[in-house]
UniProtKB/Swiss-Prot annotation:
GO biological process: tRNA modification
EC class (word): transferase
Subunit and interaction comment: Monomer.
UniProt GO molecular function: ATP binding; tRNA dimethylallyltransferase activity
Gene label: miaA
NCBIfam families the UniProt entry points to: miaA
Pfam families named in the record: IPPT
Keyword annotations of the record: ATP-binding, Magnesium, Nucleotide-binding, Transferase, tRNA processing
Protein's UniProt name: tRNA dimethylallyltransferase
Residues the record lists as binding substrate: T12, A13, V14, G15, K16, T17
Amino acid sequence: MKKRLLIIVGPTAVGKTDTSIILAKELNGEIISADSMQIYRYMDIGTAKPNEEEKKGIPHHLIDIVNPDEEFSVAEFQKIAKNHINRLIEDEKLPIVAGGTGLYINSLIYDMDFTQSISNWELRGALEAEAREKGNEYVYNKLKQIDPHAAARIHPNNLKKVIRAIEVYEETGEKIGDFSTDLNINQEYDVFFVGLTRDREELYDRINMRVDAMIEQGLIEEVKNLLSLGYDKNLIAFKGLGYKEIIGYLEGAYSLEEAMDILKRDTRRYAKRQLTWFRRYENIHWYNLSNYDSCENLAECILKDFKGHFNSL
């Protein structure tokens, strides 16, 4: 018998946290976060982590597991998340995976083998040096020659992704896009897959209000504290939404109002990319929260469909 798994995805600020907590209470579940920013300690406000009161006594896993200067790969997520899933099933609890990081979700629903890590630090260093000496465009043109399809999808100034695509090609002879297609569904789990969305204007309003709330809650102080602890502003963790904008403000690159406007704009764009990613999934049950009075009413509908799915097997 396959292991039952509930997965909840959707764009940032849509209501995944509240919905997943309600469902966890009703289904005797625990939550496994699939958010690549909530893994970091000391980064709470900018990552919208639920506090203890908001968790309502529901255990949450894969939150606060590494420091901001530590690396954490999709492979590591997959390993730890599966360990939690298997333990919860043994304890007769329902694992509920909730989050908006598409690669994390892919690692659970597809048969993705990370045993052979694709990396070439020497090549990476050489490409970074070339970018410093000759500019990002020079390195980008290398990618265009070997993988024009990837180049068309990556901005020339997104040096990290440009180098990664070159690195994968040089190490495997395969184009990076080939690793995200023709994936086989993981037969280990019987997944009830939930996708949450809202009407666009409502979602964008929620994003704007979330940014305002983050500033009021102390996001600027949180960033200052991280820097005072000695964490380098160039760390991957600081590339996340909310942190890079506030660092720009602190360095005088723009005013606080400008930083907030940039953060709101970039978060809206990120939400759009998330929806594009999740809409590629098959067998996903979509729910528009704009059609419900509350997350509680939505949860009732999801519960009915969830039980119907497994009763029909």
